[in-house]
Amino acid sequence: MLIVINHHYISNKEFEKGIYPITPKFFEDEVKKLSSRFKIISLAEIKEAIKNVEHADYCLITFDDGLKEQYEIAFKIAQKHKIPIAFFVNSKQYEDNELLTVHKFQLIRTVKNSKEILDYLSQINGVNDKLKNINLKDIILQYRYDDLEMAKVKYLINFLLPKDMADYIINKMFKEIFGNTIKATDYYMSIDNIQELAILGYIGAHGHSHNPVSTNDYTDIKKNIDFLNKLTPKRIEHFSYPYGSSSAISSEAIIYAKKMGIQYAYSMNRDINEKNINLMKINRFDVNDLSKNEKLKNIIERGE
């Protein structure tokens, strides 16, 4: 079998709400446990792992978004334990020299609760109509670990509002709260970091601006891959879908990603990978599933 486990924030910093990093100790303990149960593989080894998936147990450890703390903490822990690791990075932040909308929104949520954000959004024309048409099933599937009101807010911003409207609203809120105090250079990996990881074969693509690829803006995929191909010694072949649920992935986007040279793409469909694996929709767990998904817990702890 093959399991893939994804992560985002890693630090000892604590937020009251909105962002819930794993600690360095948690990740190191996770690495030890996974290493004792699986062969930890690199992106370059995924082809061989899939070929032998019915005869051996493999694990790929991934991080999305290319955050600076991932390089400074997660990569160093992986080096310490002599295991490979994978980082899927965006690229618009290097072009604009500011935080991506998705990360501005996450930081807003550390100081504003769901009601405060909904009240703010409700003042914008057309937002209330969008809220009425939200599909609860899609929300729960995408944001299973959020309360319903926050899940609605996140789904509205990330999927339902036109991108320019969502960007405008979030940028306005972010500016009002944080001003210019948070720099992109302090938040994301540097170009040197990416190049160092790319030489090791640890870099994949994650979309230029972190938009869902179901929005039909396939230039977001192209810009990201073109950007990374200029930095890496080998062409980018691995892609992590932003948000990763079935509603965030279109068949047209898969076709386009293949045309751009992507051979393996990773969803957030929480399941193991066994036989008949769809190479463009490889299943992936979230790190939260280590404690909350009974199937995954049984596999890791009891080898079932």
Language-model segment annotations:
Residues I5, I10-S11, H81-S247, I282:
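Metal-dependent polysaccharide deacetylase catalytic core of the NodB/CE4 family, i.e.
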Residues L67-K68, S209:
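Short active-site segment of divalent metal-dependent hydrolases/proteases
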Residues I19, F63-D65, N180-T185:
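Short, flexible loop segments at the rims of nucleotide/cofactor-binding pockets, characterized by
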